[in-house]
Amino acid sequence: MSSSRTDRATVAAWASWDWGSAAFNAVMVTFIYSVYLTESVGADIGGSIPASSWYGWAMAAAGVIIALVAPVQGRRADAKGRRRWSMTMWTLVVVALMASLFFIDNEPAFFWPGIVVMAVAAVAFEFAEVSYFAMLRQVSTPDTVGRVSGIGWSAGYFGGIFLLLICYVGFIAGEGGAFGLSTDDGMNVRVVALVAAAWYLLFALPTFFRVPEIEPDATVDSSYADSYRRLFGELRQLWREDPRSIKFLVAQAVFRDGLAGVFTFGAILAVTVYGLSPADVLLFGIAANVVSALGALAAGFLDDSIGPRPVILWSLGLMVVTSIALLFVDGPGWFWPLGLVLCLFVGPAQSAARSYLARIAPEGREGQMFGLYVTTGRAVSWMAPAAFAALVAIFGTDRAGIGGIALVLVAGMILFALVPKKPASPAPTPRGK
């Protein structure tokens, strides 16, 4: 049986994981559960360090673990012919951890186990995502890799939109949402954790069973130490044979951190600079996901027509122009259209970056390369927050932070422009089980 299936049903099954993963990214990390942890559970933890800082440190520790282990984790899954198995196992771990967050009551003592579980879930999620990304070449051809990547990214955004709406209407709006759950002990948000876990599991199931497993490599490393030694040796060889890959990994890490900064600080800026209410921020988040999804979907077809390089460069360039415009306007009336234009180009840049790497990854080493994709991203994940904070401190206004994000996007765009133009088409995926 071939380890590659490119029919529509398999592509849909693969993209279904992206749709389901929004339960963790959008609901747990970005909009709902992390806010509950830091603003409610951790509101009275005491001490001089706020709950948000402790949460940030916990996620930073998770990032260090991911950066150190992800490339080897992806490589070992590839070598053992267990790419799908690895993705499945780590996804189930994330689902279990998400469900366990139901038991985090709205009491200060529960804050500490809450941030630990969130950090461990973040590690497991990234490990699952490494193998999931590596499957891209199994479900696409050289002619369709761009649009398939775009379908996946847009599915993630649309999944987030639907689940956020369900959670907002059912459990958050007013006093406990349409179901009228208690808000005093955080029951409405705790139930959201269960709903999100069930959502993720349900939509991950098609990927578990439809995407085929890959063939194992005869040269499986016997230990993690062997894996690291082989990894560094292969990186040296990769630099000699195709330095473009290393240059791209560095460039994408920088511009993807700028993309992350748009969503990380967008809600803060919406309230402090442009005067949106907290309720309007959630509505803007839903709208932002809609336009990002549409952008990723459309860019996927452009990717296959003109290549990922111009898609990335045009997306980053237009984001920089829009960011500069936002520096000089005030009020919700300007923030809504310009903010949505900014988000429109986030999806295309993300999708095209993934398809670019899928095109140049050496055959049989996709998991390792996407592990490095994650690691390099984590290694520079401080750039956008640092640039934002530095300019805010220098100029004394949150508005200046927009310029910090724009600077990171410009740096990533310049680095990517220096990467050689045409990525090679991927070699045929090896035959499998």
Predicted region positions:
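Short amphipathic helix-loop junctions that connect adjacent transmembrane helices
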Residues: M28-S52, T264-V281
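Structural signature of the two symmetry-related core transmembrane helices
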Residues: W85-S100, P310-A325
